[in-house]
């Protein structure tokens, strides 16, 4: 069996299925106890000390679609051939990794989201740290792996962990070191925020695995920069200098974490605030991606997004792919609500807010 090689070239050219097959052996050889399913791989730390759990997802947009395969008439992804990058598709310099201009036209993206997160976790392990580690599947289509964990499985290592740290943040607000807490109140345990701010810049975000797992396991969460930009597009690239700096920051934070009393650390949700932006609505004030999320859940996706994005089909598809998860977040919350029905977004949002017992406040 070919073993995992912890290089970007190797990780970017592997399928989700290949990683699911190879990673358990990698972890076992480093003294981890491993639980491997079709939905996730959990590596339980060999350390007897309380550990955080590092999280990354194994799929990329290439896992789910080839470039240009969304059918607006059926509102489904096409069944055309998908592609995974090969070594010759990559352009690697001392500073950046991106797709070559001659790369396979079937490729939808580089796949840095979230192979950068996978590599970061492997780098942390190679540096001698032994946190719990969780690799999930199909995050890009609604956090399938993490939803499975919440609804079907009970993972003791997550219950025993000090906090959940995902490495899956791109550049959304102009910084290569962004961190996002989602609906977790970052001020509830101020020492976490104070320490992380030494290495990362606070930003807003929409959704990823830890946004599902944190409330489910009552653990503090954060999603840290993975040093990629333009995810979900063929212009996606990795900033190697930022990657190195962010990994060093994570290692420093993990060292600090080892000396903390984390026994009483819990998940505390932010007070809900709903704002209205034209024809969209958001719980995440100030985030463009939040507005994109809600645009996605309009009844007539094609008309709305084509209007907003001036006929840029590729950008509209990228937004759809980026934002599928919000619907799943509602399901995880045991609410069967949608942000749209046959009427307008605003009407449905009013109903949602009312039924959740919150006050609707137009901005």
Q: How does the language model describe each region?
A:
Residues 230-295, 305, 351-359:
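His/Asp/Glu-rich mid-to-C-terminal helical/loop segments that flank catalytic regions of hydrolases
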Residues 201-246:
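Zn-dependent metallopeptidase/amidohydrolase metal-coordination segment
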Residues 289, 316-346, 350:
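Acidic, low-complexity, intrinsically disordered interaction modules
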Residues 48-130, 140-142:
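Active-site metal-coordination/substrate-binding segment of hydrolases
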Residues 28-36, 197-202, 360-362:
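Short secondary-structure junctions
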Residues 104-187, 202:
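Acidic/histidine-rich catalytic neighborhood of metal-dependent amide-processing enzymes
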Residues 177-217, 363:
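An extended, acidic, His-containing surface patch that forms the Zn2+-binding/catalytic region
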Residues 2-53:
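A non-catalytic alpha/beta surface segment that caps or lines the substrate-entry region
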């Amino acid at each position: 069996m070919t073993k995992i090689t912890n290089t970007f070239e190797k990780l970017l050219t592997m399928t989700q299925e290949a990683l699911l097959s190879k990673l358990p052996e990698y972890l076992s050889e480093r003294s981890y106890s491993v639980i491997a399913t079709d939905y996730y791989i959990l590596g339980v730390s060999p350390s007897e000390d309380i550990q955080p759990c590092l999280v990354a997802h194994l799929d990329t947009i290439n896992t789910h679609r080839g470039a240009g395969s969304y059918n607006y008439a059926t509102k489904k992804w096409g069944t055309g051939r998908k592609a995974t990058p090969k070594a010759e598709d990559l352009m690697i310099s001392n500073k950046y990794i991106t797709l070559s201009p001659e790369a396979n036209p079937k490729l939808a993206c580089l796949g840095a989201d979230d192979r950068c997160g996978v590599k970061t976790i492997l780098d942390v392990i190679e540096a001698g740290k032994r946190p719990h580690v969780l690799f999930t599947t199909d995050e890009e289509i609604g956090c399938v792996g993490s939803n499975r964990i919440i609804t079907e499985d009970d993972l003791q290592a997550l219950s025993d962990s000090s906090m959940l740290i995902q490495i899956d943040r791109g550049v959304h607000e102009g910084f290569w070191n962004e961190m996002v807490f989602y609906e977790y109140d970052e001020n509830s345990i101020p020492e976490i925020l104070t320490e992380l701010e030494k290495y990362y810049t606070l930003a807003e975000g929409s959704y990823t695995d830890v946004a599902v797992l944190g409330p489910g396991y009552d653990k503090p969460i954060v999603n840290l920069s993975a040093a990629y930009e333009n995810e979900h597009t063929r212009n996606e690239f990795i900033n190697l200098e930022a990657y190195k700096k962010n990994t060093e920051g994570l290692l420093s934070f993990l060292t600090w974490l080892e000396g903390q009393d984390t026994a009483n650390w819990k998940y505390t949700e932010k007070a809900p605030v709903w704002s209205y932006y034209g024809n969209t609505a958001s719980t995440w004030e100030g985030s463009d991606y939040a507005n994109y999320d809600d645009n996605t859940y309009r009844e007539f996706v094609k008309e709305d997004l084509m209007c907003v994005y001036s006929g840029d089909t590729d950008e509209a598809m990228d937004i759809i792919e980026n934002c599928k998860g919000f619907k799943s977040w509602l399901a995880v919350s045991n609410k069967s609500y949608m942000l749209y029905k046959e009427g307008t977004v605003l009407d449905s949002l009013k109903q949602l807010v009312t039924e959740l017992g919150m006050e609707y406040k137009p901005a």
